[in-house]
Structures are given as C-alpha cells and as structure tokens.
C-alpha cells in the first residue's frame, strides 16, 4: 500500500500526510491504510479548492491555472494539511476577520463566499451514515458538511453542494480512479475490510520479522484527526477489536 500511495499521489500530498502521521506518533510503515486515507482526504480538500476564486464583485468564478487573472482572491482557505498550531492560528484569524463563530474542532476549509467553515468527508460506506457521524461529532449548524464516497455518491448539509457539478464530478472521478487502481493491485479489499486488513498487516509484520505486540503503542495512540478518517475503511468498534488482537505476540 505504501508504494501505491507514493506512486498515486502528488509528492506534496504524501509529504503532508507523512508529517501528519509523525505529529501524532503514527507509523506509516504499519498504518498503511491510514496513510492512504489521509492522502485521499488531503487530495479531495485541495481539489475542492482548485480553480475557485472571488472577483471584485464578490462573485464566485472558476479560473484555469494558466489564466492571467489567477491573482484573484481564492474562494477557499485550506486548513487541512497544516500542523495543529498553525491550523488554529488560521482559524482564529478567519474568525477575527469575518466574525465567524469559532468551531470546536478543526475544519478542513473556509468558504469566503458563503462565509462558513467546511468539513470534508470521504467514505466507502453509506454517505448518509458517515454524514450523521460527522454531524453528531461537530454538533454545530455553522460548519457545513460535505461527504463524498468512492462510489460517486455525495451528501451535504441542506443539500447545498457548494461547488458546481463539474467540479464535484472531478472529485468523484478521482475517487473512483483511486478505487480502481487499488483494486487492480489487490489492495482495495484490505483498505475497506477489517478482516483483510488484519491479514495484510500480519503478512507485513511477518515479512519484517517484527512482533505485533511491540507495536501496541502505535495502535493505541491515534490522533483525533486520524480517528475521523478511520470510518473510511472500518468502523471504530472493529478498529478496537483489530488492535486488541495484536496485543500479544504468538508463541514460537
């Protein structure tokens, strides 16, 4: 999976994902599914923001990268991908400037046109289930939620999808491509199935000659940000069960 991630995603996204995992003591050599999940989420956030600007009249416009008018104000402020200290600094600055209510949890983006923070979700499960989980966690009507799935489904607060249809289609196509590329390499099942993920992890540990028990710390210390990403490939109860199964090394 790690090799796939490095081949599939932009080096900048990979670097940001590595820093995020390092910040919370995660080992990307072991938590490879999480590595892929973080990269996917980062890419969707960047694609959400791409090409969207605000003109002098305050209208949202789409500008291609080569357009000379690219000096226009970006419609979205990207918060995801920054270290926590810098991310909160950006959020506080936005709140002070715009008067927006400070969110309890770090959001992914800020929309200067609609004057609201946005939480982006990517899931392979039912979009409405993941949406409800996000809404229950955030508990704020001020933060807009937009969920995408690998099957092309999406769900957003009050059915307000923020972006034009073409921009959202680009994101859906990219997610579908990632799924197809994973499947062609035999990685998709382990990405979405706890059972397959467990098999793959045992195989990886065996090939590295490591004892799974020595990795207990890595499994227990999961950042709040990464917990948000976990439902992309397994629910939290199954995650806990999977981690518990690695607390002991098998007798030789």
Curated annotation (Swiss-Prot):
Keywords from the named record: Decay of host mRNAs by virus, Eukaryotic host gene expression shutoff by virus, Host cytoplasm, Host gene expression shutoff by virus, Host mRNA suppression by virus, Host nucleus, Host-virus interaction
Residues the record marks as site: Important for efficient shutoff activity: 202-203, 206
A Pfam family annotated for this UniProt entry: Flu_PA
Places the protein is found: Host cytoplasm; Host nucleus
GO biological processes: viral RNA genome replication; viral translational frameshifting
Principal subcellular localization: host cell
Gene Ontology MF terms: RNA binding
Keyword Transmembrane belongs to the record: no
Free-text comment on this protein's domains from its UniProt entry: The probable endonuclease active site in the N-terminus and the basic amino acid cluster in the C-terminus are important for the shutoff activity. The C-terminus acts as a nuclear localization signal. The C-terminus is recruited to host protein complexes involved in nuclear Pol II RNA processing.
Family affiliation: Belongs to the influenza viruses PA-X family.
Name this polypeptide is given: Protein PA-X
Gene source species: Influenza A virus (strain A/New Zealand:South Canterbury/35/2000 H1N1)
């Amino acid at each position: 999976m790690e090799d796939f991630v490095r081949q599939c995603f932009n080096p900048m996204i990979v670097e940001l994902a590595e820093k995020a995992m390092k910040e919370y003591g995660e080992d990307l050599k072991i938590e490879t599914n999480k590595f892929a999940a973080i990269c996917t989420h980062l890419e969707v956030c960047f694609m959400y923001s791409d090409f969207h600007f605000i003109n002098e009249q305050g209208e949202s416009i789409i500008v291609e990268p080569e357009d000379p008018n690219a000096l226009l104000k970006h419609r979205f402020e990207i918060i995801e991908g920054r270290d926590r200290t810098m991310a909160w600094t950006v959020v506080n600055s936005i709140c002070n400037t715009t008067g927006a209510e400070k969110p309890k949890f770090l959001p992914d983006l800020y929309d200067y046109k609609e004057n609201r923070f946005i939480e982006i979700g990517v899931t392979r499960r039912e979009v409405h289930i993941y949406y409800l989980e996000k809404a229950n966690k955030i508990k704020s009507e001020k933060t807009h939620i937009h969920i995408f799935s690998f099957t092309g489904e999406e769900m957003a607060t009050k059915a307000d999808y923020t972006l034009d249809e073409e921009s959202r289609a680009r994101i859906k196509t990219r997610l579908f491509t990632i799924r197809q590329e994973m499947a062609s390499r035999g990685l998709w099942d382990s990405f979405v199935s706890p059972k397959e993920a467990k098999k793959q992890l045992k195989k990886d540990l065996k090939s590295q000659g490591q004892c799974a028990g020595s990795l207990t710390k890595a499994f227990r210390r999961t950042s709040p940000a990464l917990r948000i990403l976990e439902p992309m490939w397994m629910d939290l109860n199954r995650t806990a069960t999977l981690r518990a199964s690695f607390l002991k090394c098998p007798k030789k």
